């Protein structure tokens, strides 16, 4: 049997209880395949499922039926320990906190699904419950084996997050300052899961077999990069030339032509110009 601790989120706990109720008492005859989605059906509010945290892609969001992956994961572990044939299993995008790396099995309607087959010679029965802060699943049947199973895992690769920068203006509405961490990075892993069989009588290791790879995603760290406030782009300009106090136009010098000798003829009836020798400029 397998037990995994659950949180005290009321909606999530209600979903766990509904899922366990649907599983409890299911019987598989030899050769039959169990489907988690077929057994539970679509998770809807009409069936009593509530909105609770669940992964959607890379984000943790509220979904109707959120949390039931803990039930499918606990069942997956029990199926491995019973040495049943795993038909279909998918790990989460990120490690979960209620079970070991490589031992989780995510489900969603319609896909992914979790399936296993009764590869024994006798019927098996699933018992599932929520009690004492734990999800409990055990698979009952006729034990023909002279060995018992233990599961283990190895983190074969680690993928460190990189740092990404997001640009903001100095007066950004979020109020970010330069260097503020917007999103913490998440380390990714490649996990290999193994099944070891030990002789019941002697405890001697009989075999150790590879079961599955589980690739958990890397999420880069995001840091705010805020522009420096800019200085005013215009400054008072200095006149290119000092203002002149001199007149813009130089006065014309008086003509040097000597006065005309008065004519001996009689004066004309038209009066001569008083300044006939000037150029006329001001």
Region roles according to the model:
Residues 1-282:
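Well-ordered beta-sheet/strand-loop patches within structured domains
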């Amino acid at each position: 049997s397998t037990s995994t601790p659950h949180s005290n989120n009321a909606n999530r706990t209600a979903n766990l209880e509904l899922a366990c109720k649907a599983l409890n008492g299911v019987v598989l005859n030899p050769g039959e395949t169990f489907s988690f989605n077929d057994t539970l059906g679509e998770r809807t509010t009409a069936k009593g499922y509530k909105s609770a945290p669940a992964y959607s892609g890379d984000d943790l969001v509220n979904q109707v039926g959120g949390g039931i992956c803990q039930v499918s994961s606990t069942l997956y572990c029990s199926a491995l320990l019973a040495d049943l044939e795993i038909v279909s299993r998918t790990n989460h995008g990120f490690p979960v906190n209620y079970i070991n790396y490589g031992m989780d099995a995510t489900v969603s309607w319609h896909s992914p699904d979790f399936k296993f087959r009764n590869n024994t010679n006798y019927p098996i029965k699933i018992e599932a419950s929520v009690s004492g802060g734990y999800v409990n699943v055990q698979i009952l049947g006729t034990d023909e084996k002279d060995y018992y199973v233990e599961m283990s895992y190895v983190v074969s690769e680690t993928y460190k997050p990189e740092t990404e920068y997001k640009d903001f203006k100095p007066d950004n509405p979020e109020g970010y300052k330069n260097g503020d961490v917007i999103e913490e990075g998440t380390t990714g892993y490649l996990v290999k899961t193994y099944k070891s069989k030990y002789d019941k009588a002697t405890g001697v290791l009989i075999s150790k077999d590879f079961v599955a790879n589980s690739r958990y995603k890397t999420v880069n760290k995001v840091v705010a990069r805020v522009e420096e406030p800019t200085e005013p782009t215009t400054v008072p300009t200095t006149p290119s030339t000092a203002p002149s106090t001199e007149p813009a136009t130089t006065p014309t010098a008086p003509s040097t032509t000597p006065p005309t000798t008065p004519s001996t003829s009689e004066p004309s009836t038209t009066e001569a110009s008083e300044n006939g020798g000037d150029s006329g400029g001001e």
